[in-house]
Swiss-Prot record:
HAMAP family: HIV_VPU. Homopentamer. Interacts with host CD4 and BRTC; these interactions induce proteasomal degradation of CD4. Interacts with host BST2; this interaction leads to the degradation of host BST2. Interacts with host FBXW11. Interacts with host AP1M1; this interaction plays a role in the mistrafficking and subsequent degradation of host BST2. Interacts with host RANBP2; this interaction allows Vpu to down-regulate host BLM sumoylation. Phosphorylated by host CK2. This phosphorylation is necessary for interaction with human BTRC and degradation of CD4. Belongs to the HIV-1 VPU protein family. One of its GO terms (molecular function) is monoatomic cation channel activity. Gene3D superfamilies: HIV-1 VPU cytoplasmic domain (1.10.195.10). It comes from the Viruses. The chain crosses the membrane at residues 8-28. The N-terminus and transmembrane domains are required for self-oligomerization and proper virion budding, whereas the cytoplasmic domain is required for CD4 degradation. The cytoplasmic domain is composed of 2 amphipathic alpha helix that form a U-shape. The gene is vpu. The keyword Ion transport applies. This is Protein Vpu. It is a single-pass type I membrane protein. The lineage of its organism: Viruses, Riboviria, Pararnavirae, Artverviricota, Revtraviricetes. Enhances virion budding by targeting host CD4 and Tetherin/BST2 to proteasome degradation. Degradation of CD4 prevents any unwanted premature interactions between viral Env and its host receptor CD4 in the endoplasmic reticulum. Degradation of antiretroviral protein Tetherin/BST2 is important for virion budding, as BST2 tethers new viral particles to the host cell membrane. Mechanistically, Vpu bridges either CD4 or BST2 to BTRC, a substrate recognition subunit of the Skp1/Cullin/F-box protein E3 ubiquitin ligase, induces their ubiquitination and subsequent proteasomal degradation.
Length: 80
């Protein structure tokens, strides 16, 4: 009976060690996934800003080109 108790204690210790190792691996992988999500969000934000800045500058230039501008000089120009 004593050997059965020793075997049970050894089995519990081995099971506890295996559980600790498995949960450690799970925790490490979870941190990797979180880090990758942060990187993906940053990349998405950079792409959005890149698209926004590119579109705004082209759009502004097109809008400015479409505007009818008068004389650029602030003084009275009489060139008729």
């Amino acid at each position: 009976m004593l050997s059965l108790q020793i075997l049970a204690i050894v089995a519990l210790v081995v099971a506890a060690i295996i559980a600790i190792v498995v949960w450690s691996i799970v925790f490490i992988e979870y941190r990797k996934i979180l880090r990758q999500r942060k990187i993906d969000r940053l990349i998405d934000r950079i792409r959005e800003r890149e698209e926004d800045s590119g579109n705004e500058s082209e759009g502004d230039q097109e809008e400015l080109a479409a505007l009818e501008r008068g004389h650029l000089a602030p003084w009275d120009v009489d060139d008729l």
